[in-house]
Amino acid sequence: MDQSFTKNQPKWQERQPLPEPDNIRVMTSPSLPPEDPLEEIVAPFSAAAPRRLGAMCVFCGANAGSDPAFREAATSLGGALAAHGATLVTGGGSTGLMGAVNDGALAGGGKVIGVIPDFLKSKELADLRSTELLVVPDMHTRKRTMFERADAFCILPGGVGTLDETFEIVTWRQLHLHNKPIILFNVKDYWTPLLAMFDRMRDMNFAHHGHEALVTVVHSAAEAILAAERELAEPKPVVRFPGMKGT
């Protein structure tokens, strides 16, 4: 090894961790308690939906996408939630559409709860402006915490992570483990191919007729909130698929 190189390197000193701001809470408990993991997962999903929209979880991309309409829709949704008096629940990042929906909510004086895994704090640049920022140990805890904090869900354009979050809550609803509204915000027809894929699943007998009742498609922020409120006030009938208990 080149001694002249190592000789000139700075001596790193151990840094003491800085105290977290008051709005940041680090959650260290594991997502799956070893004594009874299945019960711990299912229990939160079994609760009955509330009758008013107190908080909406928004799934969206940590990137802004190629069309300015995506960011505009995200900002509009955040502002509409603030005006409605509903709390915004997000993945806790400050970039892309996640940051834009936070911008809209905070500019309107709304409350924002961010939930971010510790290992993503630097990659997604945790939004320290959040009213409450929950730092959780892993992705499973993130999704579960977001679910527990929300009365309804709205999905904006996003990538693989957004699809992961979306399919999980749709699957749980199909299995009758929750009946919270799931709103698909179809900005610039972004989700139209996904909706076509749902239909293809049905046509190829991989999904049952009635699967379309699991989600509600909207095209504006105002429509998203109205759809969530309407469904919370008058929940959709639980879709009974063949082969499931109660059919």
What is each PLM-predicted segment?
Residues 2-4, 14-15, 169:
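Intrinsic, low-complexity polybasic segments
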Residues 106, 172-180, 206-208:
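Arginine/glycine-rich "motif VI" loop of SF2 helicases in the C-terminal RecA-like domain
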Residues 156-157, 181-185, 212-215:
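Flexible, glycine/proline-enriched loop segments at strand-loop-helix junctions
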Residues 2, 8, 22-23:
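Intrinsic-disorder-associated, low-complexity terminal segments enriched in Asp/Asn/His/Tyr and depleted
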Residues 13-17, 22-23:
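Short, positively charged and aromatic/hydrophobic N-terminal segments
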Residues 5, 18, 27-29:
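Polybasic, lysine-enriched low-complexity intrinsically disordered terminal tails
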Residues 22-149, 187-247:
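A cross-family phosphate/adenosyl-ligand binding-site feature
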Residues 141-176, 183, 234-241:
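Active-site/ligand-binding-proximal alpha/beta "capping" segment
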